[in-house]
């Protein structure tokens, strides 16, 4: 079973017919089957008489979608279309991308994860549970997709800012892969969501009689890492060239897993590296628009977990690329967590935090600060020009913090990136008011435009969906065997090149969602070029590379079918 290419030049030869064909989401056309196809595939009477175009189907679906009043039911409705007719699903999403992205992914996907067992309808992807650890190869062989090229995998322990959702975390790989297709043109026949079920420490789920996961506390330590290794090794055997995206693993596991496997498999961690790439791309664009480089900015983070430190490390790398030494770059980055500013004399720092700790002598001249140096202390004394929130805690960018930030620079950059919307460090409307409209803002979740003193401010969403679809497309088009730091840096610079702010100082920081497919293609090209330069992809001309990108870019159109015997 495959719908791996999408062209009307050649028909697709398939053996399925009747109800079986209608039950295959990759192949089902519903009311769009032609008269000839209805005859050849035993479909007469199984669907209504009228033959519709995909445009007509999309219009009907959108009308039905509009009948739902709340976002979670809209999400359930769209997932039902996805599970019955994937081509129609992506046509509908493409027709209304900006409207529907918040429904199929953040913020609505957060509630969908919390209620996964409540709203479960139909199978999608695979669940690999710890009790089945002796049968991993069999589980992977049960997948009918032969040519999987992109996998998003989670263990459900740190879902957005919502914590441990057990197997409910499957909503994230499903949503992410929907965006790989809708934004990056990767055929749904090439994608596979995977959830690793190692139990849950969420007592509410353990007590829930309809929770569908393994009802045990999470395994940990060597037992956990050995199981993860079994899963990843099995994936490598089944689909040796697939890109693996790690998604929403807990901080204690995310960086060790990335460190262990990034030089063995073609893989990356979107929470660490994808978030970093889109954030750095946004900062490069904002700096260029002000006639500066990123190395001229001073940056303060609220949140020093794997995501925050991942962004910080990529900022340091970009500053070094712009001419600073490593030490000079690190001196311009301040990391604040729940224990205050991270300094070198603090105990119990994680390895990835220690490299970003500020020197003790830096803060010794700050005078009247408490032993725990607060975010406000850092903003007052370090005088940052950029404030980035990845804390998962709402409201911590207070009015005093933002007003103090705005005293130090003409156009402060404020990026409250925590997801979902309920976890954002500050509301864009408040930031605009507190800075008298001077702040450049990018958020992790979508927000409506803000009207302030008669001017409408669009709020750019610093969403990883600007980055990871292009990375996936670039990896596939080039045949890259690894995801290197240079490839990630290339994605940041490609995104910065697309910023409307570079043409108009009053424009938005990031491109419109409506343009995201073109952005993904540009990112794919730069990522693929970097892969070739790093020697992890075969050498090819720019012309061939561009042809590969266009060839791989799937569009939701129906193909003609011809029947063949089994």
From Swiss-Prot:
Q: Which residues bind a divalent metal cation?
A: 247-248, 271
Instruction: Give the family, as the similarity comment puts it.
Output: Belongs to the malic enzymes family.
Catalytic activity reported: (S)-malate + NAD(+) = pyruvate + CO2 + NADH; oxaloacetate + H(+) = pyruvate + CO2
Q: Which Pfam family name is an example for this entry?
A: Malic_M
Q: Where does NAD(+) bind?
A: 158, 271, 419
Cofactor(s) the protein needs = Mg(2+); Mn(2+)
Q: Where is this site: Important for activity?
A: 271
Please state what the protein is called. NAD-dependent malic enzyme
Instruction: Read off the InterPro entries from this record.
Output: Aminoacid_DH-like_N_sf (IPR046346), Malic_enzyme_CS (IPR015884), Malic_N_dom (IPR012301), Malic_N_dom_sf (IPR037062), Malic_NAD-bd (IPR012302), Malic_OxRdtase (IPR001891), NAD(P)-bd_dom_sf (IPR036291), NAD_malic_enz_proteobac (IPR023667)
Q: How is the cofactor bound?
A: Divalent metal cations. Prefers magnesium or manganese.
Q: Which domain of life is it from?
A: Bacteria
Q: Identify the NCBIfam families for this entry.
A: PRK13529.1 (NF010052)
Keywords, comma-separated and alphabetical:
Metal-binding, NAD, Oxidoreductase
Return the CDD domains for the record: NAD_bind_1_malic_enz
Stated EC number for the protein is: 1.1.1.38
Q: Which GO terms describe its cellular component?
A: cytosol
Q: Which SUPFAM superfamilies match?
A: Aminoacid dehydrogenase-like, N-terminal domain, NAD(P)-binding Rossmann-fold domains
Gene symbol here is maeA
Extract the HAMAP family matched here.
NAD_malic_enz
The alphabetized list of GO BP terms reads:
malate metabolic process
Q: Which residues form the active site?
A: 105 (proton donor), 176 (proton acceptor)
Q: Which species does the entry assign this protein to?
A: Acinetobacter baylyi (strain ATCC 33305 / BD413 / ADP1)
Q: How does it assemble?
A: Homotetramer.
Q: State any single GO MF term.
A: malate dehydrogenase (decarboxylating) (NAD+) activity
């Amino acid at each position: 079973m495959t719908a791996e290419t999408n062209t009307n030049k050649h028909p697709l030869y398939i053996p399925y017919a009747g109800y079986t064909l209608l039950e295959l989401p990759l192949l089902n056309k519903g009311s769009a089957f032609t008269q000839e196809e209805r005859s050849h595939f035993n479909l007469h009477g199984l669907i209504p008489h009228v033959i519709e175009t995909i445009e007509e189907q999309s219009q009907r679906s959108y009308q039905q979608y509009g009948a739902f009043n709340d976002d979670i039911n809209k999400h359930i409705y769209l997932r039902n279309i996805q599970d019955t007719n994937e081509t129609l699903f992506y046509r509908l999403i493409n027709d209304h991308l900006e409207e529907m992205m918040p429904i199929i992914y953040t913020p609505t996907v957060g509630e969908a994860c919390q209620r996964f067992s409540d709203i479960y309808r139909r199978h999608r992807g695979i669940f690999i549970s710890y009790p089945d650890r002796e049968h991993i190869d069999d589980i992977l062989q049960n997948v009918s997709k032969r040519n999987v090229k992109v996998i998003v995998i989670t263990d459900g322990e740190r879902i957005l800012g919502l914590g441990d959702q057990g197997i409910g975390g499957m909503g994230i790989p499903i949503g992410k892969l929907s965006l790989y297709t809708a934004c990056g043109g990767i055929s749904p026949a090439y994608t596979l969501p995977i959830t690793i079920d190692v139990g849950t420490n969420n007592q509410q789920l353990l007590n829930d009689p309809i929770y569908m996961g393994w009802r045990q506390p999470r395994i940990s330590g060597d037992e956990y890492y050995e199981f993860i290794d079994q899963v990843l090794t099995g994936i490598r055997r089944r689909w040796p060239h697939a890109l693996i995206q790690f998604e929403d693993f807990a901080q204690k596991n995310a960086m060790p897993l990335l460190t262990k496997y990034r030089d063995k498999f073609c893989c990356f961690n979107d929470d660490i590296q994808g978030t970093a790439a889109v954030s750095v791309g946004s900062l490069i664009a904002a700096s260029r628009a002000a006639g500066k480089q990123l190395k001229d900015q001073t940056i303060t983070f609220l949140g020093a977990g794997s995501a925050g430190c991942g962004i910080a490390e990529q900022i340091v790398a970009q500053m070094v690329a712009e001419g600073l030494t490593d030490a000079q770059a690190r001196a311009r980055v301040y990391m604040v967590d729940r224990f205050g500013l991270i300094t070198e004399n603090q105990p119990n720092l994680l390895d990835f935090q220690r490299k970003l700790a500020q020197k003790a002598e830096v803060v010794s001249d700050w005078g009247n600060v408490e032993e725990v140096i607060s975010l406000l202390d850092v903003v007052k004394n370090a005088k940052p020009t950029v404030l980035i929130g990845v804390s998962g805690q709402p409201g911590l960018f207070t009015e005093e913090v933002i007003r103090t930030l705005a005293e130090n620079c003409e156009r402060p950059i404020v990026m409250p990136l925590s997801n979902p919307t309920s976890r954002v460090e500050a509301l864009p409307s408040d930031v605009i008011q507190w800075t008298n409209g001077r702040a450049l803002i990018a958020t992790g979740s979508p927000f409506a435009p803000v009207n302030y003193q008669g001017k409408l401010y669009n709020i750019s969403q610093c969403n990883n969906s600007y980055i990871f679809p292009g990375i996936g497309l670039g990896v596939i088009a080039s045949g890259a065997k690894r995801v290197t730091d240079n490839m990630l840096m290339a994605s940041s610079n490609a995104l910065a090149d697309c910023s409307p702010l570079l043409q108009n100082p009053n424009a938005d920081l990031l491109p419109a969602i409506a343009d995201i497919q073109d952005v993904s293609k540009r990112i794919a090209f730069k990522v693929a070029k970097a892969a070739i330069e790093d020697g992890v992809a075969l050498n090819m001309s720019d012309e061939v590379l561009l042809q590969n990108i266009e060839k791989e870019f799937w569009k939701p159109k129906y193909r003609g079918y011809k029947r063949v015997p089994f």
